[in-house]
Amino acid sequence: MEDRYGREIRSFRLSITPKCNLKCFYCHKEGRNEEHGKLMSADEIVKIVKSSLEFGVRKIKISGGEPLLRTDLPKIIENIKDDQIKDISLTTNGILLEKYAQKLKDAGLDRVNVSLDTLDPVQYKKITAGGNIESVKKGIEKAIEVGLTPLKVNFLAMDCTVKQLPAIMDYCRKIGAILQIIEFIPMEPELKHHHIDVIPIEKEIAKKADQVFTRKFMQNRKKYVIDGLEVEFVRPMDNTEFCGHCTRIRLTYDGYLKPCLLRDDNLVDVANPVRNGEDIRKYFIKCIEEREPFCKAQ
């Protein structure tokens, strides 16, 4: 199904918990800055995902908080697995990944994205308020070993991390990971000074790239291949290409369909309808009707 701007709905991002075992100073909590209602159960999440398939969803992204804190995560993955779904992936901080990688693979998870903004143990501990970078590296190694690939490393480009980019690129090249360079969205005024313009970084990568591809169903974003390393950029701020080609809807952990990453004023309650046994297709239609590009071309 397309929205009124001609954008197909292909991807569904599920935030399954607000809880996390790290306290990164920049966390935007999937656009939900305060804890709200009741956590969705595994069965409720599965019902909602199954209903989404009718509207063209073919890719599922699971996130949090930290999704590995939910002990029923393998059950969720196993039960949403469907012949119509081409890809089920997970975004994690990687702290618990070594422990759960095999279980996730066995349940039907296809691949993982792991957040890693620095290779400096001291800086990592500071950014995450106590995290152990060695646990993350071991988790990445285990994920690759069990076949949760292609693994992506999510690098958040900020004033305090950008100097780490060359080392991160070398690391990703060495382990065979894809590098995703993400523009920082400051959700609080006091964090604005950490934002940097990633366009010059992308231009520099583009100059050195051996190959360039366009990902049609991922906001028309470019993929660059440079000395064997695949690099992608995620630039949501003031980006008409990102918004104009968005194919994703979201589910909050407390059961609201979220038409737009950058808005929190047009959520559609689907938790209560699913708990009441209603046909929830009309709520997906409402969500899709609410979709409009946050940044529009002039």
Curated annotation (Swiss-Prot):
Binding site for [4Fe-4S] cluster 1: 20, 24, 27
One GO molecular-function entry: GTP binding
Annotated cofactor note: Binds 2 [4Fe-4S] clusters. Binds 1 [4Fe-4S] cluster coordinated with 3 cysteines and an exchangeable S-adenosyl-L-methionine and 1 [4Fe-4S] cluster coordinated with 3 cysteines and the GTP-derived substrate.
Swiss-Prot/TrEMBL keywords: 4Fe-4S, GTP-binding, Iron, Iron-sulfur, Lyase, Metal-binding, Molybdenum cofactor biosynthesis, Nucleotide-binding, S-adenosyl-L-methionine
UniProt binding sites for S-adenosyl-L-methionine: 26, 65, 115
Residues noted as binding [4Fe-4S] cluster 2 in the record, renumbered to the chain: 243, 246, 260
EC nos: 4.1.99.22
GO biological process: Mo-molybdopterin cofactor biosynthetic process
Pathway in which the depicted protein is active: Cofactor biosynthesis; molybdopterin biosynthesis
Protein name (Swiss-Prot/TrEMBL): Probable GTP 3',8-cyclase
The species this protein was found in: Methanococcus maripaludis (strain C6 / ATCC BAA-1332)
Gene from which the chain derives: moaA
